[in-house]
Structure formats: C-alpha cells, structure tokens
Amino acid sequence: MAEKYSWMLGDLSVREKDQLEVFRSFEIFPQGNGVAWDLGAGSGIQSIPLEDLGFQVLAIDLSEKLLSEIKARKPDTKIRTKVADIRSRELYQGVSPELLLCMGDTITHLGSEKDWEDTVSLWSSFLSPGSKLILGYRDLSYGKPGDQNIFVVRSEESKIFTCQLQFTQNKAEVTDIFHEKTDKGWTVSSSSYNKLILPLDDLIRTASRNNFKLAKKDEKNGMKFLLFEKL
C-alpha cells in the first residue's frame, strides 16, 4: 500500500506549505549545528520544508520506496535518507541534531506504550540540552472500546481511499481500504494495523519525565503539534 499513501495525502506541495507554516509558527530555524532528523519521514512533506528553512536534513523511514519519492519530487535536494526503525538504539549514535521531529502520526504506529516510552528515553539520552523536539499526531482517546468509525479519506472518479477505525482499550485497529477502477472493473486492496491511543496529557507527562519541556502546542485539521525543548 506504500504507493497509495502519497496519493492519499493529496497535493504534496500543499502539505509541505502546511508543515512550513507549523515550523514558522514554532519559530523553527537553524540555530546550532543546523542538523535536523525527520523520523518517519515518508515522502518528505516535513523534510523538504526543513531543507528550505536551511537545515541539513536526514530523513528516516522504514519504507525505501517512500523515501525515494523525496529525490523524485526535488531532484536537486541534499536531503540524506536512511531506512531504519526509529526504535533502534543503534540509530541514535554520533553527533545529535539540534532538531528532532516525529510527525505524520508516526508515534501512534509504535507497537506498544512501552515502545513509546522507550523511544522517548532514547531521544532524551541522545539529544543535547537546548535541542528541540517536534511531535505531530492524532489523539484517538475520544474513542471508547467497541466504538467503530469509518470515513472516506480521499476520492476521485477512479480511486477511493477509505479508513475504518475499531477502538479497543489502548489501541485503535485501523483498516485502510483502497478502491481503484480499471479497464476490468473495480479492484480492492486493504491493509490493517494498530495505532496507539496516546492521550495528550499522558504524552506530555511522558516527555516531561524524560527531560523535555513543552514550549508550544498547536492543532490543525485534527492533528496536534507539540514543540519541546530538551532540558
């Protein structure tokens, strides 16, 4: 389904402008070593605006296909890419960036609350005091166990992307359903996975316990954006 997700996001240049607005509202610009890491970078809708702001960007994702779209969309980019799991201790070595961001709902794709807590701990150990951390995610704590929600994410004459949420105790079971019209009729493909339910207050407390101080927060189209400073 990786090739479907970039289409699902819509006009990526518009998405990049949206992310740039978030960064500017948080007064993000190079101040230290000028290095930014984009965790769960996907096709680069955060990485490209960060480069435009003057950062040297390392885009990290599990999907090599999605990362390859960065160069395809911006042939002259100097963004470096790396296929890696953001939970891996081996990833966090060498000189730490002045800015670490994990957006696009990446943190909710972690396997468990322990994975989330362990990952924040890795960030805290890796980053230097004064470094910035930006998180962007959807707080799914509005759903109660047993609740179900289904909605169309994007549709065109020949393509429909639908998402179904089934809420359990600490997770939401997500099924992405993609309909595409071909010469032979409609085809259907789907992918199911879990998303962590991370209530905003709990997330902030976990960050605080790991020496991250909340500096600013914002919300746009249901996505929460949080800026932390490493103490």
What are these model-predicted stretches?
Residues 134-201:
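SAM-dependent methyltransferase
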Residues 156-159, 201-216:
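A SAM-dependent methyltransferase catalytic signature shared across enzymes that methylate proteins
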Residues 44-89:
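Class I SAM-dependent methyltransferase SAM/SAH-binding core
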Residues 1-31, 33-42:
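Conserved class I S-adenosyl-L-methionine
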Residues 117-129:
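A short glycine-rich, Lys/Arg-flanked "PGG" loop and its adjoining helix->strand segment in the class I
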Residues 91-100:
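A short acidic, Gly/Pro-enriched loop at the edge of an enzyme's catalytic core
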Residues 210-212, 219-231:
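Core SAM-dependent methyltransferase catalytic element
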